[in-house]
């Protein structure tokens, strides 16, 4: 990316914008707020393709020691964030520039949506001062992403950056997990505000956690059915892995000596050669 390109609508270059950032500890830019908020949510890596609308986020990530994985296509970045979330159980994060950067990532976000994967998609946008004026790569990202995310919104002020990231991250884990989209206009990212005017939620604050406990009587009845069955079999699906219940599931299968079939993300928790691993028969 050429950081010396003029910003949309004239004005300073991207490199000039960064050079003008205050060094005072009493103020902070929107991009640095993004990085601090991501750090508070446990994010240690972002997947992205470098773009002018989001450059200040990179500056903040460097200061917060958040790893930047710069790929060659935004679809790859979205799929990588999805894969990261599935393997770690933590929040995956993809950052894209405005317009085609956002739309290129849609297939990966749609995959995360159907797979119930907690992915936060942060997207750039033209400046608020140029809203509806045909600024560079301006698209209705929030409306486009709404059908394939659990939460889709735009940050309209720098002071709200951190708490809206916390809100979007919370939605990724509330109930059935899934992706959230947060659009942040360029001037919101570049603007500096007083640290005292910023709301910085505590790490994981208000993070909902729901677990299906089940009725004890039903669980006891199910156990009796399994023990008394003549030819039982168990089908294990994706939630066994996403809920990190695979160790208990394997212990159950082996303790009761019951064959198990695996679907979705549960495939692989037992190796194909295991005596309790049964292959499906398709016609």
What are these regions (language model features)?
Residues 2-283:
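N-terminal alpha/beta PP-like core and its mobile active-site loop of ThDP/TPP-dependent enzymes
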